[in-house]
Structures are given as structure tokens and as C-alpha cells.
Amino acid sequence: MSKIIGIDLGTTNSAVAVLEGTESKIIPNPEGNRTTPSVVAFKNGEIIVGDAAKRQAVTNPETIISIKSKMGTSEKVSANGKEYTPQEISAMILQNLKATAESYLGEKVEKAVITVPAYFNDAQRQATKDAGKIAGLEVERIVNEPTAAALAYGLDKTDKDEKILVFDLGGGTFDVSILELGDGVFDVLATAGNNKLGGDDFDQKIIDWMVAEFKKENGIDLGQDKMALQRLKDAAEKAKKDLSGVTTTQISLPFITAGAAGPLHLEMALTRAKFDELTHDLVEATRQPVRQALSDAGLSTSDIDEVLLVGGSTRIPAVVELVRHETNKEPNKSVNPDEVVAMGAAIQGGVITGDVKDVVLLDVTPLSLGIETMGGVFTKLIDRNTTIPTSKSQVFSTAADNQPAVDIHVLQGERPMAADNKTLGRFQLTDIPAAPRGIPQIEVTFDIDKNGIVSVKAKDLGTQKEQTIVIKSNSGLSDEEIDKMMKDAEANADADAKRKEEVDTRNEADALVFQTEKTLKDLEGKVEEAEVKKAEDAKEELKKALEGEDIDDIKAKSEALSEIAQNLAVKLYEQANAAQGEAGEATDAQEGPKDANTFDGDFEESK
């Protein structure tokens, strides 16, 4: 069975891992980095992903960041003269990670386990699955990020019984999960979180502070300047990282804008104390989900054996301090917060292929599921933190006499009224025979699969007529749309490969021209004029081809020059050998022959 890669599709950074033997390994990207920025840019019709896209973000307005925060919504982003869904942009990141894995493994990769925040709803999970499909990946499993982290942490500890709390604060989302580990079973007891809280929010607090301070000093609002804002974002992210290790950092942005008197520079010092003050409300927002998860799991802090920190934002000292305070535990530092999720996803891939034995993953649904009933009430069928996959049925009836149809309004959330929860979908069960209210028996069944994706069935027990839907949110893509996007993605991949081949061909041709010129200089006056002219002509032909766009012509001219250059190189080599031989003979001749009766010796002059 071919390898199933593990992918952590993050808000700010992503990572890809693979199981080698029994060990999960992070695959470095072509730049040698173990994580890849979740950044996509468009330039001259070319799609740029990762480190290269992030590097040019300041000067390129066609750069898209933090697309994960839009997953599961109908919001689109405009770039490159067209509109893209969040799934399409995410697919470009996934394609990049897929190519990295293929280059490392030396084989095609078609299957993946992709992680999502535990608190992702059905629409966001479905969007992630669609993104994988567009990227040409069969998504074998969607795994919650804290669960994947626990899997990576606990794989070599399957003989121990432990309860662990995973605190996962990433670039755009926050989750807390509590798991029980024992005998190879990873059982999620509870999960809580916030899909709108992460490192990006901490960056924004610094940006807002810099904008306000600069306006106070110079009367200019940098918030209105797109290019300045991108520089501020980069500086804020760097300052935040610096303050995890030092207590003060200098922010220096020369020529940030211009005033009436000329260019203006931004120079500010940010202390950790000020940063803590600016972000106090964000850190505090992580407290309640920790308590909620413990309460839902029916545990107290003394029951927790280990606390794992996951996500780059858990390096913030104030966050670490809050976790210490809430759990009365020193967080476990044995896992890399940026890499552990992808490693866990790769382990789950190994469980699916059978390479990892005796490991069972029991995940939960993060939010309650149910339907709207009379009076706009939300009636739950499946409570949050129910182990998945699961199925639950309940019988309802009509609200009016002779009601011919019932509307099934499917919801996800925790609020008592339907209007306050997230709508997953609506459908109708029709042709109900005329009967007084309360008589027809309508059975509603919820199914949640191992990926946390929901399907709902309504059945009239009297007529046995039923209607089923797999939930598709407003942002959900039809199969036709996904197929079209897959074809576009494949075309982009082919175009990228072709563009790379063209660049490589041009680079090789340039190098060949340079090498030929060097060889001709070395051979000056040592070979026949006709041979030199032949090489000169071929070289000029190639230089001329390089000025054009015909890659096949460049290849043909390169091959012709390469053959001539090789012959010249052979001649140069032969001449060098011949010269060496002559030099050796000349030395022997100078020393002259020695007579058999002649001896070498030292002598002194006697006085």
C-alpha cells in the first residue's frame, strides 16, 4: 500500500510528515525548512506558495494569508483577476506540500490524513476535505489537531495509562482537548475551543498599538496604507516572537511613509510588559475553554497527568503562565509545538495502512447536533463530546392537522434557541398522509462519520418514505465544481512544472555559454582556427536562441554547442597531458645520466 502522508494545514504555517518504519518524520520543504508558510501569491500569472510567497508579500498586493480562517464560509478572495474560494487557495498550499512529499519519497502521493482544529464545525471540515480533493489527494481521514498531537506524544507510551490535556493555540484557532491514553487506545474525553482566536490576533494588537503611536507622533494613519500595513504585520510577528525570549524588542521600519517634510521612519521599543497588557484579553479568552473541557470530562486538575502545548502561539510567556495556573502542572516540553500535529497525522496514516498496530483513535464531535422544533427551539439529538463515529435517532411528529410535509432544519451549537446556532442544512420530507397533529411518526436519524462529517435522514414510519442529505453548507462545493477545480489545479501543476523546466533549460544554456567562452580562452592559439570558429558560431546561435521564447530551439542549440564544447574539452585535456609529459622528459634530460661508478657525497674543504 502506498504511503499516506500526514498534513497539518495551519493558519500561518503548514507541515507535512510521513511514517518511516515506526517513526514519524517531518519532511523539509525545498528551502530546507520544516514548516511552510500558508501563504499564496500571484505574480505575472504564476502561483507562488510558501516561503517565496511570504518573502514578497510586502511588495505584492496579490498575496493571500490566513485563508484557513475563511474555510467553511462563502467568502471569496480576489487575486490574479479572478475570485477564488477558500478551498481553492487551501488546495494550492496542499499541492505544494504534496509535491514536497513526492520529491522526498521519490514516488507519487495520492492519499493523506489532514488535521483540523477540534472546534471546526461540519462546514469547515467538509471544506478541508474538498480542498484535499482539489489538490489531487484522497483524504483518508480528517483528524482533530489536539488528537493528532496526543497520538505523536503517546505512541511510544501505549503501555501507560495517562490523562493528558492538550492546549493548542495556533495562528488562527484555539482548542483544548482532554484525552485518556491506555493500551493503545487514544480516547478523547472532551474538547472545547474558539475558532476565532490565535496568533494573528496577538499580531493585530501590536499592529494597532504601532498605528496609534505613530499617528500620535506624526498625525499620519498607517492603517490606510496597504504596503505599510504589510510591513507592520511582519514587524509585529517578529516582535511577538522576540518577546518570547527577551523582555524588550526594538521595532525599526525606515521609510515607512512620507510626510510634508519628507520620509518618516518608525522606531519603537516594545516591552514584554506592554505586550502582556495589550494582549491580556486574548490570553484570558483561553481560560474558560480549559475549565469547560475539564468540566465536560468530569475531571479536576489533579486527574491530569501531562499537559501538552501545541501551536506556535503557546511560546508566549503569558500563555504558558496561564496554563500553569489553570492546570497546576508544568507543561510537557518533549514535543515540538510546530511539528507534532503533522507527525500525529502521519501516524494515523500508518494506522490506516496497517503499519502502526494496536492503536485505536476515539475522537469526539465538538458541538451538539440537532434540529429546530416547534417554537424555534433547538432540540439536541447528539450532545457535544460524543465519541464518533456515532448514530442517533429520535421520533418527532407534525405540528398541525393534515400537515403534508415537514421541514428538517439541521443545526450545530449549544444555544437553546435554533436562531442562535449554526445552520448546517435544510431539507423536506413530503407526502405525509393526512392525519391529526401528533399522529404521524417521523424518525430523524443523525449519522456522524469518523471525519466528523454529518448526514441526516428523515423517515415517515407510516409510509416508510425517507429523505437523506449529507450536510452541505452554503459554502459547500458541488461535485462538478470540485472536478473543475481539480482540473484547474492539475493544469496549474503542469504549468508550474513546464515553467520550472523552462527556467532550468535557460540556466543550463547560460552556464554552457559561460563554460564555452572559458574553454575557448584556454585554447587560444592551441587548436585550429576552423574548430574555434565552429564553437564560436554555435555559441552565438545559442545566445540568440536565449533571447527568444522557443524552449525547444534553446534545447537543440544547447545540444549542438555541448557536443562541440565536449570535443574542445577533450583536446584541452590531451594538450595538458602532453605538456606534462614533455615537462617530465625535460627535467630528466637536465639531470643527465649517472655513471654506474659515480657516487653522490658531501665533502669538506681542508685547510
Swiss-Prot record:
PANTHER family: HEAT SHOCK PROTEIN 70KDA (PTHR19375). It comes from Lactococcus lactis subsp. cremoris (strain SK11). The gene is dnaK. It holds the Pfam family HSP70. The keyword DNA damage does not apply. The modification Phosphothreonine is found at T173. Residues 578-607 are annotated as: Disordered. This is Chaperone protein DnaK. Acts as a chaperone. InterPro entries: ATPase_NBD, Chaperone_DnaK, Heat_shock_70_CS, HSP70_C_sf, HSP70_peptide-bd_sf, Hsp_70_fam. Induction: By stress conditions e.g. heat shock. GO terms for molecular function: ATP binding; ATP-dependent protein folding chaperone; unfolded protein binding. It comes from the Bacteria. Keywords: ATP-binding, Chaperone, Nucleotide-binding, Phosphoprotein, Stress response. SUPFAM superfamilies: Actin-like ATPase domain, Heat shock protein 70kD (HSP70), C-terminal subdomain, Heat shock protein 70kD (HSP70), peptide-binding domain. Belongs to the heat shock protein 70 family.
